[in-house]
Amino acid sequence: MAGLRYSVKVYVLNEDEEWNNLGTGQVSSTYDEQFQGMSLLVRSDSDGSVILRSQIPPDRPYGKYQETLIVWYEAENQGLVLKFQDPAGCQDIWKEICQAQGKDPSIQTTVNISDEPEEDFNEMSVISNMVVLPDCELNTLDQIADIVTSVFSSPVTDRERLAEILKNEAYIPKLLQLFHTCENLENTEGLHHLYEIIKGILFLNEACLFEIMFSDECIMDVVGCLEYDPALDQPKRHRDFLTNDAKFKEVIPITNSELRQKIHQTYRLQYIYDILLPVPSIFEDNFLSTLTTFIFSNKAEIVSMLQKDHKFLYEVFAQLKDETTHDDRRCELLFFFKELCSFSQALQPQSKDALFETLIQLGVLPALKIVMIRDDLQVRSAAAVICAYLVEYSPSRIREFIISEAHVCKDSDLFINVIIKQMICDTDPELGGAVHLMVVLHTLLDPRNMLTTPEKSERSEFLHFFYKHCMHKFTAPLLAATSEHNCEEDDIAGYDKSKNCPNDNQTAQLLALILELLTFCIQHHTFYIRSYILNKDLLRKALILMNSKHTHLILCVLRFMRRMICLNDEAYNNYIIKGNLFEPVVNALLDNGTRYNMLNSAILELFEYIRVENIKPLVSHIVEKFYNTLESIEYVQTFKGLKIKYEKERDRQSQIQKNLHSVLQNIVVFRGTIEEIGLEEEICFMEDAGEVVMPPLEDDDEFMETKRTQEGEAVMPPLEDDDKFTETKRTHQEGEAVMPPLEDDDEFMETKRNQEHEGKVDSPKRTSSGDFKFSSSYSACAAIGTGSPSGSSVVRLVDHPDDEEEKEEDEEEKEEDKEDETSPKKKPHLSS
């Protein structure tokens, strides 16, 4: 077989470990006189020059891979590869090499791994992983497809090498030329191979290849290749759609050719990504990341070019705000802005802010207000999308514009009320526009994105504005849907169920949207929404919807009520209890019967929440009003648990009442003691001043009994005729200053007169008030010879150095004694 020639490509590994193509030629194995042995000789196809002359020494390791590659190293870091066009030629040359080295040609490598250094084997492995593409011809399309599809299971370096070959050898234009050939020949097999090849190249995810494939010269041919999916019976005519159906409209003539070309390219790229390429799995997301980035980059460039052209944008806004602009023209202008806002999502935050700031300054909000009241559904939908973009960008700027209108517009003409009206009047059966506008309202009403500064509180200002000017319009559909069912306050569920409930599907969806936003308001607008709900009796009216045939609407009502209960607000709890607003909920549970569904679970969860959180007013209300009705529900322990909570609280309150009654009794007794102590302190104070004023002597037994109970005070017991003096003396010795009974017998009076003269003790004088007044040099206890002057209960001594005054007092005392002898007998009670 010596002398046979086979077509090959010769590659050499450079210092950077990259493969360089030395050229294409014919290889043969011949005897070389210079080397005195067999060698491989490759001559160029173009000029017959020698591309490669390589000796085949007996100890050099060779390897055969992929049926078309023979690889070896001639020196360190100098790898060589012969890439055969025909596997048969590769096998023939491989036999020549094995024969020259005395090896078995059935093996895939001439090196014995156990005998060679590990680094030599690793070098062979590097060469064996080399990717080499055959010539781009019809009969090699299957090989090319195999290489491109198999490279994804190889290391990343192989994919990079393949991308480098495709770029450097202008392989993609050659493939697209073959596409035209196959299409002309109706070569279906070749077209299927081209589909796999082009799809594989796209999944290489290389920006340098995208630049080639998506150029004006190549992009439509790429689309053509992707039409021939082997999984389809007939190819899809995507090129016809892009060429004939997808018309590019310039709302304002674009003079920048680069901008126009970029717009065309981006549209087609998006079409390829969305329509032609299969949706990647979660493991293949990164395969198209560069393509996504490529599209985003294009969009950012388009937006930047338009943003710089102020004349272009000004003209667009002028026509959009012009009342005389035709509806079709206005629709085109609005769609342009919709695409512009969509493209803006590809911008960096700083660039996006600059764009929307430009749009707001040019008057996009007044323009939207004009188009949102048009009859065209497409126009209103596009306006809703644009509005959502603007609110997402800067809700504060939109709120500022809305509040500024209050001074120049009627309530019905306010921008936010226009939004509410369009949401309510959305004619789309699926309420697509209403959903967009609900998102807008939700963002505007979210206090978490409201600014608060020392000078201004956006939250209070905007919410006050909204609840004053807008809330009644927002809730109008809810109030209208329930107005025919207004019932007595104590019987919300007493209306005729045969009356029209909002059973229309579209109306039910709208009411559900309204209730969802009201639920959000309960959570975030505590004061404002509470006042509105209580004033409008909103929960009662919402609960009328519990009779709707739409379960999703009933669940919205339950969420609305549950959010209210979650706050555990006293005003809400009282409102629910006084209005008996649990009745429609209980009725709905009973009407649902034994069906285990979302409605059943939602209602049970509501009661379970009340039980777990132990909201005491609601627990008591539910048990007292509904336990007899709910007692039969035993498949959950919720209602029994509520009864247990109720009984525990009742017992606790009963115990508290008992304890409180006992405390109140103690307080009454304590107050009496305090009053007595106060009286004692008053007497002591007057004693300190030099005189003791005794209160009037009372005959009332109760009064005297109270006085006797006071300890540590000077007590004058009642005058008795019996022998109680001894007992009085004993009491005095125990620490109390007690006056003995004043006796009428002669012996007692004689003794008393002697004591008065001996001790110079002045007898008490009656004051004008009827009290006794002591002003002696000894205490009352000393006057009867008992007690100690230093005792705590002894009346303090008051000195009277003037003897003349004492004599006068003695004389007065004698006169009083005479009067006592002649006057009727009376037993005075002395007590401090």
Swiss-Prot record:
Ranges annotated as biased composition (Acidic residues): 801-820
A Pfam family of this chain: EVH1_PP4R3
GO cellular component terms attached to this protein's record: nucleoplasm; protein phosphatase 4 complex
Record family assignment: Belongs to the SMEK family.
Name under which the protein is recorded: Protein PPP4R3C
Transmembrane segments: none
GO molecular function annotation: protein phosphatase activator activity
Any one Gene Ontology BP term: regulation of double-strand break repair
Region described as Disordered: spans on this chain: 708-832
Biased composition, class Basic and acidic residues, residue ranges: 725-735, 749-765
